[in-house]
Design a protein with these regions (language model features):
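Core catalytic alpha/beta fold that binds nucleotide/phospho-ligands
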Residues: 1-211
Length: 211
């Protein structure tokens, strides 16, 4: 298995991280309940990378439910993640959010809070597109800060998925990537403020929130 960690990040909110370093067939062997998706995956995706993303999230869901003491009946349905018309993932009795990036998959879940997560691999490509997601009244002078702004806004977009927010509809309040490890993001449409925690590593930026 390739679970990096599963932890409670807020009361009643679990966050899981999976490193996708296995082959597709290994996941089918390790998690027999995923065999039910084999034919549909073959039809839908030609690329093994997309298949691996699909399976890794569902394997991670299984491990997180198991860690939370879920019944065998619920564990047998750990792959039953669907999406609504807005693209928001849904799972029976839980609020969930998922994200993938190069080599990693992340999942956050809660029974009673809206949750959101985003993960992006560490790259300077964000420099080239920063004008698309940064507002003029936001301060993001270095690469780390720009990555956090980007991921934090993606997280808040998911948190308010029904509102179909644009990047300019969100404003990240000033923060320090060296000491704060969290930032506040204002939804300018409804005036609500989301507290977004973030983690910076040599490989990725991870942001998550709950409301």
């Amino acid at each position: 298995m390739a679970v990096v960690n599963i932890r409670e990040v807020y009361p009643g909110v679990s966050l899981g991280l999976w490193q996708m370093d296995e082959e597709v067939e290994q996941l089918f062997e390790q998690y027999p309940h995923l065999q039910a998706y084999k034919s549909s995956l073959e039809e839908k995706y030609k690329n093994d990378g997309r298949k691996l993303e699909f399976l890794a999230i569902r394997a991670l869901m299984y491990e997180m439910l198991k860690a939370n003491g879920a019944s065998k009946g619920l564990l047998s349905h750990a792959g039953d993640i669907i999406h609504n018309e807005a693209g928001k993932p849904l799972f029976r009795g839980y609020h969930i959010s998922v994200s993938h990036t190069k080599g990693y998959a992340a999942l956050i879940l809660s029974r009673n809070q809206e949750v959101a997560v985003d993960i992006e691999y560490f790259s300077d490509r964000v420099e080239r597109i920063s004008s698309k997601f940064l507002r003029k009244d936001e301060n993001a002078s270095d690469l780390d800060s720009k990555l956090v702004h980007w991921c934090a806004k993606e997280t808040v977009y998911k948190l308010f998925s029904e509102e179909n927010l644009k990047f300019d509809d969100m404003r990240v309040k000033p923060f320090d990537t060296m000491s704060d490890w969290a930032c506040d993001v204002e939804n300018l449409k409804n005036k609500k403020v989301a507290h977004v925690d973030f983690e910076l590593t040599m490989e990725f930026v991870l942001t998550y929130a709950a409301m």
